[in-house]
């Protein structure tokens, strides 16, 4: 590679990173404005209307229903991140609806959460409630940041793979985050350090776990440090790790490419949990 070509590639890469940081700042501002909208919600799932009528659906939506009604109607539960609420998923929810997924629900675990295993028990109860209410034995869960870790604990450690077909995580500190060392006195944050007992517990054997996992991790994530710690690397789990370039922590639930990839992954349902090809 010539020096000139290398310089051009570096310049393009830096431009993409700068653009990603600017978008991250913009989404951070927008989310602060939307945040109050998510305060008025119970912790139990908010059930979305299930639509079976194809009239008024886009060709893309009709195509999904035509090729897989069960995939289109499998419930999806959205779980937000730390110090947040379901407003972070406003764009993601709209994007998934446009792609034909019609049964979306939201779960808020509360600002006072201090213990991930206990939060996982409560989330599990909500998932099982949603499963019973919709008649689907297994649903999908999309978790942002801490929400993905709570959901993973339920799926991997509490038998939640019996109720969750696919867990998608966005910027989730599966291997902890070095940033957590800055606040060691906070019980919840302490669980997020890379060498915490919780992170070590999640690294223990998980043979027989039926769920599939799709983990997105970015290179400019300012909360998961280093960004590769959002990868889910476990020999017993069925995982697809997806790197996203130039997308920040808050931008992940609002990124069109990520929403498209999630939709592609959820289009196909396999009883054994093996993923479709995004």
Question: PLM features: residue spans?
Answer:
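Serine-dependent carboxylesterase/thioesterase catalytic core
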Residues: 76-87, 93-210, 216, 223
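Post-His helix in hydrolase/transferase enzymes
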Residues: 253-267
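Flexible, membrane-associating and regulatory peripheral segments of lipid-active enzymes
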Residues: 1-76, 90-91, 99, 268, ...
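Catalytic histidine-centered segment of alpha/beta-hydrolase-like enzymes
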Residues: 115-116, 247-256
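Acidic catalytic loop of the alpha/beta-hydrolase fold
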Residues: 219-225, 249-250
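Short glycine-rich catalytic loops that host catalytic nucleophiles or stabilize transition states
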Residues: 106-110, 241-248
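Short, proline-enriched alpha-helix->beta-strand connector loops that line the catalytic pocket
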Residues: 72-74, 207-213, 235-240
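Short alpha-helix in the alpha/beta-hydrolase fold that links the catalytic acid
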Residues: 92, 225-232
């Amino acid at each position: 590679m010539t020096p000139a070509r290398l310089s051009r590639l570096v310049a393009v890469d830096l431009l993409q990173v700068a653009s990603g940081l600017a978008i991250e700042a913009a989404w951070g501002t927008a989310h602060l404005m939307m945040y109050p909208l998510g305060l008025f919600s119970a912790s139990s799932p908010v059930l979305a209307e299930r639509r079976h009528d194809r009239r008024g659906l886009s060709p893309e939506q009709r195509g999904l229903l035509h090729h897989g009604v069960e995939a289109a109607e499998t419930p999806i539960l959205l779980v937000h991140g730390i110090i947040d609420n379901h407003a972070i998923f406003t764009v993601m929810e709209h994007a998934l609806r446009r792609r034909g997924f019609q049964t979306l629900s939201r779960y808020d675990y509360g600002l006072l959460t201090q213990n991930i295993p206990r939060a996982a028990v409560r989330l599990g109860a909500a998932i099982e409630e949603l499963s019973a209410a919709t008649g689907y034995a297994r649903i999908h869960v999309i978790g942002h940041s801490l929400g993905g870790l709570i959901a993973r604990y339920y799926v991997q450690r509490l038998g939640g793979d019996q109720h969750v077909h696919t867990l998608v995580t966005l910027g989730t500190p599966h291997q902890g985050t070095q940033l957590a060392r800055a606040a060691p006195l906070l019980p919840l944050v302490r669980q997020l350090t890379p060498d915490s007992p919780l992170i070590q517990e999640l690294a223990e054997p998980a043979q027989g776990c039926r769920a599939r996992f799709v983990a997105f991790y970015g290179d400019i994530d300012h909360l998961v440090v280093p960004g590769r710690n959002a990868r889910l690397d476990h020999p017993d789990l069925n995982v697809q790790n997806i790197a996203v370039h130039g997308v920040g922590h808050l931008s992940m639930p609002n990124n069109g490419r990520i929403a498209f990839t999630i939709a592609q992954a959820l289009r196909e349902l396999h009883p054994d949990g093996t993923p479709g090809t995004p």
